[in-house]
Amino acid sequence: TVIAPATITQAQRRLVKMLEIFQYGFLLRALVVGLLVSLCAALLGVSLVLKRFSMIGDGLSHVGFGALAIASALNLAPLQVSIPVVIVAAFILLRISSDGKIKGDAAIALLSSSALAIGAIVISQTNSATDMNSYMFGSIMAISNDDLVLSIICSVIVIVMFVLFYNKIFAVTFDENFSKATGVKSGVYNTIIALLTALTIVVGMRIMGALLISSLIIFPALTSMRVFTSFRSVTICSAVVSCVSY
């Protein structure tokens, strides 16, 4: 079958038009940051879902929203305020759930609703509603070079961690008590997962928004678990599904 030259020319024109989009810097940054955040969220999401911390992304994103509202009201740099606040919140959730006095889902709901309420109160008293909408629903225009650098660093750390400490993460994810008995420092690896999750949430809020960032953690992992049964296969499939879906 011979393809008509006009058909080839039309296809080439469409390809050129698609590539011309990336001449805009903000679109290129949005694509790179989105793919890297999707990759990080998918890899971390497998462990979080299996450890029954599926809603930690939603909880930390609401904490980040509250921190961003306060930073905007005080005219402070958003990332410099939100990153340490979300990291501390992740450690608090990890500590509360490990004590066993409050279940993990209850702790997430408590912290999430409180932070969201604080953010709403702060916004109502300031004139930063426009900026806050970009954090609630995401905005590709809000991606800066700092976000790009942070997303690259975060993705490299996550990938290296999964490659080097795959067996220990596997043990901590499925049976934390057994991993402690075998000498694995489960607290250290849980802390690392919490730290990386907090960084991923903060960066992802810029492009996905506080209301949708948790979907990058939950949906790819759950979809992969319907297809594969091994931890390695689920992790790889989750990363592919997340990047393609974005």
What feature does the model see in each segment?
Residues 27-38, 76-86, 152, 202-216:
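Structural signature of hydrophobic alpha-helical transmembrane segments
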Residues 2-39:
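Membrane-interfacial amphipathic/re-entrant helices at transmembrane-helix boundaries
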Residues 31-36, 79-84, 109-110, 148-153, ...:
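Hydrophobic alpha-helical transmembrane segments
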Residues 213-246:
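Transmembrane alpha-helical segments in multi-pass inner-membrane proteins
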Residues 46-128, 224-237:
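Short loop segments and helix-boundary regions at transmembrane helix junctions
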